[in-house]
Amino acid sequence: EPNVYAEAIVHPTATIVGEVFIGPYVNVNANCVIRGDMNEVVINESSILMENVSIGTVPSILNSGEVAKVFLAKKVILDNNVRLMSCYIGEDCFIGANSVICEGAKVDDGSIIGPYSVVPPNRYIPKGQVWSGNPARYIKDVEKPERVGLIEKMKELQENSKEYIKEISDYSNAYMLSEELVDQGKTTSLYCPQEFEVKIVNKKYED
């Protein structure tokens, strides 16, 4: 069953199935689909999934011998319509809109994948680089203004998600129950999809 950290924000239209861990302050926006029914999906602290993101896994072991799971480190931004399959995304990465990251690929910390890019199976993207295209190719190293811009974008997206989810949930039974539990000192996520029994956890997931 999915495990959602108490401070995560999950949009009501998102679908979460199987062995999925969603860490604290993660934002999962409208129409996202996260499937951990073949292998696990781990989404760590403060990562943001924009609208229509699709995350899935393949059932087999990767060529590297590793389990074919999806792992997102802290503070990852997945823009609209991104698709991930059994890959690793490092801390502070940005994946541009409509991009595809294939199974076995690894995007290392602080890297940027341009929009409409395809990172092929088992491709390694080194730290702090910009890659783009189909297939994705090296463009340049990430510059300081780009890094600062991404930090500001993340802050803005997090605030927008919190306000939007609160606005649409204010009068729902799920939200009022959530508020009541918080007042009682119990932990709960702001919203959990009612289609699943979601276990709330208060521990960090280590790779």
Feature names for model-found ranges:
Residues E1-Y25, Q194-D207:
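Extended, small-residue-rich solenoid/repeat segments and analogous flexible loops
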Residues N3, D37, E45, E51-K74, ...:
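Glycine-rich hexapeptide-repeat left-handed beta-helix
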Residues I16, A30-C32:
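N-terminal beta-strand/beta-hairpin edge segment
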Residues I22, E40, R137:
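Short, electropositive, low-hydrophobicity segments enriched in small/polar residues
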Residues V28, G36:
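Conserved H-X4-D acyltransferase segment
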